């Protein structure tokens, strides 16, 4: 995530800041500028084109720090959410704040990398939308269906998430990870078409395989022997769809961590764009960085980061 500076006093700002603690200026995130900008006393902002922006209406209930275009109540990120927990569901609403924060994070990440985000509408029924649901009173299945991503906001609870992670024997499980994985499914449907489809099949396998049958096989037999040489995770071995989504998610994990390391002066190597392939980025930048970060975690008595 990009490092930000207050435009009034040049103090450091972080992605979710709504106030500069140094000079006291109210702040809001401009998706158009990919930057945190100072607000007027009334909570407004006028950009270089003369367009007017205001604080998102979800600032209170979702902790949103983004700006909405004049005439719109919601910012771009919040407008993608089709369903949220009922306001009487206190637990669900608390968890919903965490889910929305993760969604804002990944949208900026996708914008930075140039991935197209086309919202669902009457004219675009398979566009991107989110159902952020509470499992307090009903079962919620995380997944993707024709552009609609469903997230169980209970995954924001560390104890719940760790219990599920241990049960499924997963090395990594976070709210941000769920968004990245499900967005992998979405972008496969958007980007993997035409000639690219055959290339994807060469890499990930035939996506027309019976999905339920492959799920049953995976949970009854486990991953194939030697899976580590061809897959990013055991979950990726289940079906070509999951292989693509897992690979996409880990691509975002790796890219974000490298970018953060560079932003905060932890790396002095050549930029990722100077490498020919992403494999070269992994070998040249990611492996040395992940080893160092794992050692730092172990020095604090924690498990490895990656």
Task: Identify the residue ranges that each predicted region occupies.
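Active-site recognition of the HExxH zinc-binding catalytic motif
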Residues: 20, 173-193, 245
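Short cysteine-rich clusters marking metal-coordination/redox-active sites
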Residues: 6-9, 20-23, 47, 53-57, ...
